[in-house]
């Protein structure tokens, strides 16, 4: 920690025994499976830095590996394979500008969010996964007085159209297993807060 910055770094290394993992087979129904032993390790980092009295930047992110420590024949997994439904990296970078609007204390914040990919099974099949994606968010806040605040938020500022979840697998079921879920489109919200 310094005069205009702060930083935190955490390393973790966990040996799991009797871990429960969630599996999504071709039928579409999820179930929990006794995964036996697994290892997870990685880093978590966050920092803030005040560039000047009005402008500051902050970052928070993590990077990890999560692997089975044993062979799981029934699921086609070998020791060292990535665990299903685990995200190996994600981060957020934010830029904040403090100012005044019509003499009211205000701020504007722009965030870049990155979400890493994950897979439903040990096979890491892209047709049954959550792909990685990046999106922008924007917030503008105004302190009207000591008790009330007004905030406008724009989620997915650039209206990015990308897949959040893909499920397209071969199966003997009579019902097609071929669909996709998108991340939410640009969404604008207005929030008024009053403290009493």
Q: What residue ranges belong to the model's regions?
A:
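Gram-negative outer-membrane beta-barrel transporters
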Residues: 4-8, 13-15, 33-122
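Short, glycine/charged-rich beta-strand-loop motifs at protein surfaces that mediate ligand recognition
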Residues: 10, 123-130, 136-141, 148
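Activation segment
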Residues: 20, 55, 67, 161-162
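A generic structural micro-feature
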Residues: 37, 130-132, 182-184
């Amino acid at each position: 920690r310094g005069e205009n910055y702060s930083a935190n770094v955490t390393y973790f290394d966990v040996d799991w025994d009797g871990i429960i993992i969630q599996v999504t087979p071709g039928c579409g129904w999820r179930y929990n499976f006794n995964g036996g032993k697994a290892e997870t390790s990685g880093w978590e980092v966050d920092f803030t830095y005040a560039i000047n009295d009005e402008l500051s930047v902050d970052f928070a992110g993590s990077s990890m590996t999560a692997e089975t420590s044993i062979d799981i024949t029934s699921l086609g997994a070998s020791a060292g394979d990535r665990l299903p439904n685990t995200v190996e990296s994600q981060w957020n970078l934010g830029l904040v500008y403090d100012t005044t609007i019509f003499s009211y204390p205000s701020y504007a914040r722009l965030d870049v969010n990155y979400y890493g990919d994950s897979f439903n099974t040990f096979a890491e099949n892209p047709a049954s996964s959550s792909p990685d994606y990046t999106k922008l968010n924007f917030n503008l806040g105004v302190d009207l007085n000591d008790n009330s605040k007004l905030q406008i938020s724009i989620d997915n500022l650039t209206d990015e159209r990308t897949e959040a979840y893909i499920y397209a697998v071969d199966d003997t079921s009579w019902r097609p297993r071929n669909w996709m879920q998108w991340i939410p489109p640009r969404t604008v919200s207005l929030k008024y807060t009053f403290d009493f």
